Amino acid sequence: MTRSIAAAYRAGELPAFFRLPAGDLAAAASEPRLDVDRAALADALRAYHRDLGTLDSGVEAQLTRLAHPASRVVVTGQQAGLLTGPAYSVHKGADAALLARQLDREDAPVIPVYWVASQDHDAAEVASTTLLDHAEELHRLTLDLPQGVPVGRVPWQPEWTAAVLKLLDRFDTAPEYRAAVRARVEQAIRGGGSFADVFARLIHGLLAPTGLLVLDPLHPALAHLMAPTLARELACPLEGPARIEAAARRLEAVGFPPQLRRPAGATNLFLEEEDGQRRLLRFDGRQFHTDTRLYTREELLAVLEAGPTRLTPAAGLRPVVQDALLPTLAFVVGPGEIAYGAQLREVYELHGLRQPLLWPRLSVTWLEPNVVRLLSRLQATAAEVQADPEGVLGRALARERGAAAASAERLAALDAELRALTAELAALDPTLEGAAERTRARTTARVAHLQTLALRALARQEDERARQLTRLKRHLLPNGVPQEREMNFLTFLLKHGEEPLRKLLSLPPGAQAEVPLS
């Protein structure tokens, strides 16, 4: 089984790969960030929010607090998904706000910031979204985004508006809830701009009451502040990748698969070329090149000077650019980002920075009333269903039908009996001990496998009768993916009004929760 870097980090392992242990908020808060020009940062964010159409008194108040010389930031971010994308995109923003609220002090304000990954150019990852209505019909909407172009450069299209509103209008739910979500979406679209701008307005609209600020790295005022970090990277373009590869080898040596690899010559930089395509920069020791042409360092520095939004960081540099710009106290991250972080400690040091605290993000599975009833009958949690849906249903049916042959207790009793027999045989003839033990292990494993097959057969029979497993999977494993990684958060607002948002913002930071809805 593949070892999880995120699980190891949560357990306090891998100290050589992370500067601060998980949860060490006191240490993170005690480290001042005197190198950040907070006034310039606040001015740039003000310009962005003004252009986005979200600059109001609440944002101004947060920008004033950000300009405080001792201010810190709890930052999170995500790709700019369609209609906010999977639910965890909203969950991450909420967690940043919850953690900032916990850490906030009058003499050291802490502001939550959401980094909108507008530079990302993988259209396939952001162009689709999934919703589930009251009739338990899964709605999958996919827009035709151009591939290879940063989503912050892709103008929102009128036909996309029509497709989104058509989906909302045929969603089976209470009219008042549909109208409220429709109003949110229309307001986000009305401001115009890019695909990423619509995402940013939706995220901000949901979480603005918490004081969350949104940040788009493609906004010229913000990109200008990031240019010095990118210029430093151009000065030694292969050193960062070399440090990432060295960390990858160290991870492999202790049994963990690295998340990031940098092939020979690959830098940590992308260039948006004249045709609008974002391409990886490579360096051969003398010149830079993409798949299309060669560049000198001087040419790239001129690009950075003339249009700093065209030179953007790859995954191995993006967090460093973020934390050079922001006075980061904590970075709210998912499991994949934690795995990246295990390889970036020395990349931060290359830029004269200290890697901030990585805060494992809040995780929520929403349980609608019919799901709560089914889970109660099955005597299972949502997580157990997501891990093994057929097994959960099969075990429940075996209990109901008194099918002891498929129970864990029966297997344990068999194993205990075989262990006793093995010991007795070994006492009669010690040379038989090894063979007897191997026979016991094989027999127990084989019976366990047969039990699994029997339970799955029971589950299939029940599913054919009542479709209960299919219904549970539709809620908890839509399209075979755990709920918060697939289902759009707007699903729950469409069916339950503002209740999910209220409950989300009442959770403790970093919660791992299964939350019932009424």
Swiss-Prot record:
It is an enzyme of class 6 (ligase). InterPro entries: Bacillithiol_biosynth_BshC, CC_BshC, Rossmann-like_BshC. Residues 404-474 form a coiled coil. The keyword Cytoplasm does not apply. Keywords: Coiled coil, Ligase. The keyword Endoplasmic reticulum does not apply. Belongs to the BshC family. NCBIfam families: thiol_BshC. This is Putative cysteine ligase BshC. It comes from Deinococcus geothermalis (strain DSM 11300 / CIP 105573 / AG-3a). The gene is bshC.
